[in-house]
């Protein structure tokens, strides 16, 4: 796969040997790729492939309020597009998810009194958004239309437990 990407990025062509064809990229062709530092795959990117990308590191939001605001805005835009039969999520439920994610990422509770095991997954802001969106769908289609902890729990489990063996102690 990496060799194919190098050809595409360097020569701006996609060879298709089975069809004895090559497809030339149009002007302005770009590839945008994302990666998480904690979410590593089986093979690291080769140095040749790394040289063909510009790396932009996006840190996690500095404060919990900043992260809550990001999640709230993205969830509201998702809800508007999907037209879910659920009420606008309560800020307290978004705060609950973001707090759980931040505490697990940091390996300690917000007050610093209790140490926690960190999971193998990233628990990114994007995953928090996904958990709340999933909870909204659950509450809208299978619940009473009001987002609550019961609607969120399956999404939280899925985000936290990426490796059932390694993450068993966390859950």
Enumerate the language-model features and the residues they cover.
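Canonical AAA+ ATPase core
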Residues: 1-84, 136-141
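Residue-identity detector for glutamine
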Residues: 2, 24, 106, 166-168
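Short acidic/histidine-centered micro-motifs embedded in hydrophobic/aromatic stretches
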Residues: 8, 100, 155
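Context-gated lysine
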Residues: 12, 40, 50, 88, ...
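Proline-rich intrinsically disordered, low-complexity coils
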Residues: 59-61, 85, 119, 158, ...
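Conserved AAA+ ATPase small/helical "lid" subdomain
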Residues: 68-71, 75-151
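C-terminal engagement/docking regions of AAA+ P-loop ATPases
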Residues: 140-171
């Amino acid at each position: 796969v990496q060799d194919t990407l190098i050809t595409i990025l360097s020569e701006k062509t996609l060879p298709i040997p089975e069809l004895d064809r090559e497809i030339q990229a149009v002007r302005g062709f770009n590839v945008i790729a994302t990666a998480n530092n904690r979410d590593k795959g089986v093979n690291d990117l080769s140095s040749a492939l790394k040289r063909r990308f510009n790396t932009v590191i996006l840190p996690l939001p500095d404060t919990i309020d900043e992260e809550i605001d990001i999640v709230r805005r993205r969830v509201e835009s998702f809800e508007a597009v999907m037209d879910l039969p659920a009420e606008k999520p309560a800020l307290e439920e978004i705060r609950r998810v973001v707090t759980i994610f931040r505490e697990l990422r940091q390996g300690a509770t917000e007050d610093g009194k209790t140490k926690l095991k960190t999971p193998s997954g990233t628990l990114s802001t994007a995953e928090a958004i996904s958990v709340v969106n999933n909870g909204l769908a659950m509450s809208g289609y299978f619940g009473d239309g009001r987002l609550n902890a019961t609607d969120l729990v399956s999404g939280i489990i899925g985000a936290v437990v990426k490796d059932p063996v390694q993450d068993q102690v966390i859950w």
